[in-house]
């Protein structure tokens, strides 16, 4: 195994869902910016980046969220950095956001955009993404988990712990964030939370996973 392969495997064995962080240890600005950049630079379906990363460092807000986030209470108290990942709503070919991405970010020439829109519509129809608003939002939310995974892997490579969380009252937390002007519910929904910091103690037992042959199947020669 090469040094790089070993480094990657070591990071995955190091990573675990840290329930309680050492509140005295803070992630450096440089390291945390690298974690955020790994999220921002993550791949997404059609390259549309249907996400927003909101870093919650205000302790009063963390305390308010804690009362409605049963799966994140200890992390909200102790994490060095706490991130909410929003998923964008209404990502359709002719929505203002997609038009902005095509014209201003990807710099498509005007005459090529109708063909791109047609391919976009066909893709969403084939995958039943455009069937209803919930399917459309779920598709965006899936993309946020790509960024989430990359952020946690980057953290592990830097020797930083993390914990992804879905254990919260979605409606109540959404209301709190919306009332504070943090979440525009017309444009976004809260997809997932993730905390970063340094573990208070090592996990009590080794990582457990199913066997390789139980979850991986090769069709054709194994090379």
From Swiss-Prot:
InterPro entries membership: NfsB-like (IPR033878), Nitroreductase (IPR029479), Nitroreductase-like (IPR000415), Nitroreductase/BluB (IPR050627)
One Pfam family matching this protein: Nitroreductase
Enzyme Commission designation: 1.-.-.-
Disulfide-linked positions: none
Top-level taxon: Bacteria
GO cellular component term of the entry, any: cytosol
GO biological process entries: 2,4,6-trinitrotoluene catabolic process
UniProt GO MF annotations: oxidoreductase activity, acting on other nitrogenous compounds as donors, with NAD or NADP as acceptor
Cofactor(s) this protein requires: FMN
EC primary class: oxidoreductase
UniProtKB keywords: Flavoprotein, FMN, NAD, NADP, Oxidoreductase
Record has NAD as a keyword: yes
Annotated PANTHER family: NADPH NITROREDUCTASE, OXYGEN-INSENSITIVE NAD(P)H NITROREDUCTASE
Protein family according to the UniProt entry: Belongs to the nitroreductase family.
Name of the protein in its database record: Putative NAD(P)H nitroreductase SAB2397c
Organism: Staphylococcus aureus (strain bovine RF122 / ET3-1)
């Amino acid at each position: 195994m090469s040094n790089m392969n070993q480094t990657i495997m070591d990071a995955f064995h190091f990573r675990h869902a840290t329930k309680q962080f050492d509140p005295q240890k803070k992630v450096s600005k440089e390291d945390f910016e690298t974690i955020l950049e790994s999220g921002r630079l993550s791949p997404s379906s059609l390259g549309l980046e249907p996400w927003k990363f909101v870093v919650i460092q205000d302790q009063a807000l963390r305390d308010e969220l804690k009362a409605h986030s049963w799966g994140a209470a200890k992390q909200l108290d102790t994490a060095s950095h706490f991130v909410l990942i929003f998923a964008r709503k209404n990502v359709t070919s002719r929505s203002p956001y997609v038009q902005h991405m095509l014209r201003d970010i990807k710099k498509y020439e005007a005459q090529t955009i109708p063909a791109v829109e047609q391919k976009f519509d066909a893709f969403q129809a084939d995958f039943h993404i455009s069937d209803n608003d919930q399917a459309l939002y779920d598709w965006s939310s899936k993309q946020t988990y790509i960024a989430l995974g990359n952020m946690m892997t980057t953290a592990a490579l830097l020797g930083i712990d993390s914990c992804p969380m879905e254990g919260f009252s979605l409606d109540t937390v959404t209301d709190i964030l919306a009332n504070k002007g943090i979440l525009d519910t017309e444009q976004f929904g809260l997809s997932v939370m993730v905390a970063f910091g340094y573990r208070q103690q090592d996990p009590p037992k080794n990582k457990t996973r199913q066997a390789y042959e139980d979850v991986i199947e090769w069709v054709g020669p194994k090379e």
